[in-house]
Amino acid sequence: MNVAYVGSLVPAKGFDLLASAWPAVLAKVPDAQLFVVGSGKLYNRNSVLGKWNIADEKFENKFMKHITNDNQVLPSVHFLGVLGEEKNDLLLKCRVGVPNPSGNTETFGFTAIEMQSMGCNITTMKCSGYLDTVFTKRYLYYNSNNLAKNIIKLLLQKEHDYNEVYSFIKQNFSFDKIVLEWEQLFKEALPGHKLLHPYSIKKNPFYRLKFIKLGLQGMKFRFNFLNQLPTIEYFLQHSWDKVLWHINNK
């Protein structure tokens, strides 16, 4: 009943969301174990860590209160620091992987690929990168309040489509596949080409109004004055996202 988090322990990577969900997971799955691979020093070895030597003091204070008791880390939580390839041995023993629960700053999310290739089921924020890299999308959430519920379901489920997941990764993210896509990108980036990604509309066209964004991208090549207009993402962040937040937090 193991759960894994792999990543930097900084606010942008959202570990605090997983920590706050952990007590609810334990309430339903008492033998669940959380393995945390990473550190506040992952990307900056000169960072000053807090009391627990895990993350920045302010960030530690935000998440440690959820996973400590009597000033001791819960027995079910294991901080392993920064690991190399040996983390794969750990992931092979985990049922659930939770990469960046906040989804912030993610454009691809390679950790999700690593976790799935080792047999982990994924639950995390429904955002651009993970829509492409996560095979089973029904456990991607808009609201982090669903994180604990998703972890519990994945820990308790009896069946897992390992073969389909592995085929998905091999077909979409193998070395041979990615090298050809880079070659295609460089060729299409030559001067005079209308779009760098004319085929990208095929994937998740309605997410964040992607089909409109790509349509405008083509028009902006022809009509420069359109570059002065607010972006579609700006519109979403200042209208639709706020509506969703109020609905989810009622």
Enumerate the predicted regions with their spans.
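Conserved donor-binding/catalytic core segment of Leloir-type glycosyltransferases
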Residues: 1-13, 19-23, 34-37
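Short acidic alpha-helix that forms the nucleotide-activated donor recognition element
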Residues: 64-69, 84-94, 117
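Nucleotide-activated donor-binding/catalytic signature segment of Leloir-type glycosyltransferases, i.e.
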Residues: 47-82
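Acidic donor-binding loop of glycosyltransferase active sites
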Residues: 92-107
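Short hydrophobic beta-strand element within catalytic cores of glycosyltransferases
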Residues: 117-124
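C-terminal amphipathic helix plus adjacent low-complexity
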Residues: 166-250
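Short glycine/serine-rich donor-binding loops of glycosyltransferases
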Residues: 109-112
